[in-house]
């Protein structure tokens, strides 16, 4: 895992098309802004896990 330190207003680029910007920090909470192409799904982890759990019973075993 790559660990980076950023200040409010600074960004991290992922590849050529994704930018994550630190918008604010309050206590233990960090606000992120994410710019990504429309074909790239961006979800909070708990939402992503819920989506995967809902899809799992519908997938055919291979």
Swiss-Prot record:
> What job does this protein perform?
A key translational regulator that binds mRNA to regulate translation initiation and/or mRNA stability. Mediates global changes in gene expression, shifting from rapid growth to stress survival by linking envelope stress, the stringent response and the catabolite repression systems. Usually binds in the 5'-UTR; binding at or near the Shine-Dalgarno sequence prevents ribosome-binding, repressing translation, binding elsewhere in the 5'-UTR can activate translation and/or stabilize the mRNA. Its function is antagonized by small RNA(s).
Q: What is this protein called?
A: Translational regulator CsrA 3
- Localization (cell): Cytoplasm
Pfam families from the UniProt entry: CsrA
Q: Which domain of life is it from?
A: Bacteria
BP terms from Gene Ontology: mRNA catabolic process; negative regulation of translational initiation; positive regulation of translational initiation; regulation of carbohydrate metabolic process
Query: Which species is the source of this protein?
Result: Pseudomonas syringae pv. tomato (strain ATCC BAA-871 / DC3000)
Q: Subunit details for this protein?
A: Homodimer; the beta-strands of each monomer intercalate to form a hydrophobic core, while the alpha-helices form wings that extend away from the core.
The similarity comment for this entry is: Belongs to the CsrA/RsmA family.
Sorted alphabetically, the keyword list is:
Activator, Cytoplasm, Repressor, RNA-binding, Translation regulation
GO MF terms on file? mRNA 5'-UTR binding
What's the chief localization of this chain?
cytoplasm
GO CC terms for this protein?
A: cytosol
